[in-house]
Amino acid sequence: IDFEGRKWEVSAPEAVMTCSAVAYFFAKQVTEVLDIPVGLVISSWGGSRIESWMNEKTLASIDGVDIEAARSSKLKMHHRLGCMYDTMLWPVRNFTARGFLWYQGESNIFNYYCYAPMMTAMVQLWREVWEAPNMPFYYVQIAPHKYKDSQDTDAALLREAQIKALEIIPNSGMVSTADIGDEFCIHPPQKDVVGLRLATLALTKTYNICGLPSTGPTMTKVNYSEGKAIVTFDNASAGL
């Protein structure tokens, strides 16, 4: 990527028309709370697979991954191993960053079983590239949707893998979209809510702002009795 002649874009209607809505609302909220400018470096491609956001060495270190399939020339470029990493991440590595936001997963429900280790390895790689071993990594759990060409449980198992990754990746955080998904539209319209939830998470965990509800209800256990399931949640002091 050639950055010559490029400059930071000021937040204005003409600049944000093509900006990620989630990223915009995230930055807007953080700016308002901290009263400081927030810059966004947006490296994204709709529908990309996680394999495309890491290099081959990283992906090859993960058990259960088919490297040959991931590098296949039959794949779309944004699905192919290393493509997004080489073209959209590596070129911006010299920008100082405060943290990463990640909103992806829908294109990987077919291999949910290795998603948690793939995301863990990817985050480790990115932190090594930025020479920041504890850089915050906040991500969005995929929304409920009737995904085509998949088993009914695949998306739920991918969400479960995202929760598992939360337990493995240090200094990470996840926001849920379970209440704002759309069965028939893979792009839920309430991007402002997603951005606000990510901002609240960052304000709490990175900027140490107290008193914000930064985490949604999290199931901790289930007990079964007389044909009923009794579910216990954390982070639900105000109820579900």
How does the language model describe each region?
Residues 1-240:
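Cell-envelope and extracellular/periplasmic
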